[in-house]
């Protein structure tokens, strides 16, 4: 897919990895819809930087834990730009909570944003993506491919994203490709100290942490070159799953 001039919606585009993904698409000339909820400042800063560089970007606020809002978000983007070519489902929350310590409220928060919102955002985007013969990329995680007991709800939610990606790849074929990226330690949780970061690096066969640029490279492969790839999970982890 030629990206320049096409429309991309990135959920959770105001901070951390979502912002890095959105910025990369804007830098390649995509018309950018930057979704945010609690990160309005970061989204606005990214929008302004893209516009200053000669690009086009608009911020869209929405609480994606509301299924109606999640389904409506892509329709708002189509109303603004007239089309939607790419959907990147990146919005997520991650809490360090074991199975025993997870409350019903925490469970709902994680599953509602990390999994349910992806389903309904995809549902709202389906007709526009089909019309554009577009692409969808869901941000999964290593925690969806191996159990992370300390992040119980998060691990379960991302496993759901992996299976949802395969379901959507079937449902939206042949017009739309749907894939997922499962990053490893490309952007570690903000609360991790130096010891935890070092432990992560040592547990990776490449003996280093990754960076957001590694996830960006995976996204660009799927969008620009992965035209015959659908229903797959691209793992970007420096080999951690080989342990």
Question: Where are the regions a protein language model picked out?
Answer:
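Conserved glycine-rich cofactor-binding loop
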Residues: 7, 14-15
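Conserved glycine-rich Rossmann-like NAD(P)H-binding loop of the short-chain dehydrogenase/reductase
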Residues: 30-45
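Substrate-binding pocket helix/loop in short-chain dehydrogenase/reductase
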Residues: 98-99, 106-111, 200
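Active-site helix of classical SDR
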Residues: 122, 157, 165
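Alpha-helical segment proximal to the catalytic Tyr-Lys
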Residues: 127, 169-174
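C-terminal substrate-recognition "lid" of short-chain dehydrogenase/reductases
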Residues: 128, 212-236, 241
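Short, small/polar-rich loop/turn modules that mediate ligand/substrate recognition or access, typified
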Residues: 173-177, 229-231
């Amino acid at each position: 897919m030629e990206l320049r001039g096409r429309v991309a919606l990135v959920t959770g585009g105001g901070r951390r990895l979502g912002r890095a993904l959105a910025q990369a698409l804007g830098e390649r000339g995509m018309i950018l819809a930057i979704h945010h909820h609690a990160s309005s400042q970061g989204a606005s800063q990214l929008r302004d930087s893209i516009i200053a560089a000669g690009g086009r970007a608009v911020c869209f606020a929405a609480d994606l834990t509301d299924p109606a809002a999640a389904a409506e978000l892509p329709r708002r983007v189509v109303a603004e730009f007239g089309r939607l070519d790419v959907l990147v489902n990146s919005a997520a929350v991650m809490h360090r909570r074991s199975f025993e310590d997870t409350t019903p409220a925490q469970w709902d928060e994680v599953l509602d944003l990390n999994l349910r919102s992806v389903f309904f955002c995809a549902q709202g985007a389906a007709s526009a993506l089909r019309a554009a013969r577009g692409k969808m990329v869901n941000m999964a995680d290593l925690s969806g491919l191996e159990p992370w007991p300390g992040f119980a709800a998060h691990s379960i939610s991302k496993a759901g994203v992996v299976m949802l990606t395969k379901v959507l790849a079937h449902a939206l074929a042949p017009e739309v490709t749907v894939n997922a990226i499962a990053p490893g330690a490309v952007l570690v949780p903000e609360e991790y100290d130096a010891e935890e970061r070092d432990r992560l690096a040592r547990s990776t066969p490449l003996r280093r942490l990754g960076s957001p640029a590694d996830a960006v490279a995976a996204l660009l492969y799927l969008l620009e070159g992965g035209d015959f790839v659908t229903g797959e999970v691209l793992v970007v982890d420096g080999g951690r799953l080989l342990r």
